[in-house]
């Protein structure tokens, strides 16, 4: 099984504060990997490192075959990334956004044109073609942002709280898109604060105070910790850490 992310003893410090404390895990091709943790748990710091935006204090990190210390620029060019703010330009049209990001990733005009036609048809955006992104419903913005994040067919895409603020039906539709992308062999690395969404992942890790306190499939973790839901497990881990 191809490994797209390999992390070994990752430590990130800010002065005396340890944001990431000896993190070790692997993520595989075509896997949907949930990266869970409360605000301040350290997951955002770790994601910045995995995306090539920051260096670790120590430890080994490889993403898509590239070393974080030597190949940060290559990592940035070979991953997809979607933030909860969607990273779209509201004053540009749909086609202009696709053209802009396709150009950043070095795609040819022919490929960009083909992708534009494909996305407009897939999302039913014919009536919005000449209108700015700001005119789009939130759910459609979300789906378009995801498609643009994988326009260059990266081995891995990072999704940072991608379903924040959308209704349950749109969330479900978005997850269908995630499954379709994973079926193509793309690794999907996702953070979410919706504990029910964790159940949709192949495996999840749960961070508490800078450490990974649980790692495995949702079923494995619920069985191991004797909980009915991932939310119960999350609360249990937080309480255990606080009591210790």
Summary of predicted features, one role per range:
Residues 157-161:
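Catalytic Walker B motif of ABC-type/P-loop ATPase nucleotide-binding domains
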Residues 99, 103, 110-128:
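Conserved ABC ATPase "signature" region
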Residues 215-216:
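ABC ATPase "signature
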Residues 59-70, 74-75:
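Conserved ABC transporter NBD signature motif
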């Amino acid at each position: 099984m191809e490994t797209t992310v390999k992390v070994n003893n990752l430590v990130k410090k800010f002065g005396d504060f340890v944001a990431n404390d000896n993190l070790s895990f692997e993520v595989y091709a075509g896997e949907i990997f949930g990266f869970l943790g409360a605000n301040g748990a350290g997951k955002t710091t770790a994601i910045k490192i995995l995306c090539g935006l920051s260096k670790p204090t120590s430890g080994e990190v490889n993403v898509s075959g590239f070393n974080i210390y030597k190949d940060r620029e290559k990592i940035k060019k070979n991953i997809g990334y979607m933030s909860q703010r969607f990273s779209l330009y509201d004053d540009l049209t749909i086609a202009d956004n696709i053209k802009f990001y396709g150009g950043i990733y070095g795609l040819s005009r022919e490929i960009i044109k083909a992708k534009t036609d494909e996305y407009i048809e897939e999302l039913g955006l014919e009536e919005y073609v000449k209108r700015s992104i700001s005119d789009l419903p939130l759910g459609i913005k979300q789906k378009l942002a995801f498609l643009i994040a994988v326009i260059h067919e990266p081995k891995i895409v990072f999704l940072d709280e991608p379903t924040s603020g959308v209704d349950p039906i749109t969330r479900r539709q978005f997850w269908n898109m995630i499954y379709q992308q994973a079926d193509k062999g793309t690794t999907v690395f996702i953070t979410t604060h919706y504990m029910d969404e964790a159940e949709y992942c192949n495996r999840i890790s749960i961070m508490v105070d800078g450490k990974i306190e649980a790692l495995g499939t949702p079923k494995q973790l619920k069985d191991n910790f004797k909980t009915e839901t991932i939310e119960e497990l999350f609360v249990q881990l937080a309480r255990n850490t606080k009591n210790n």
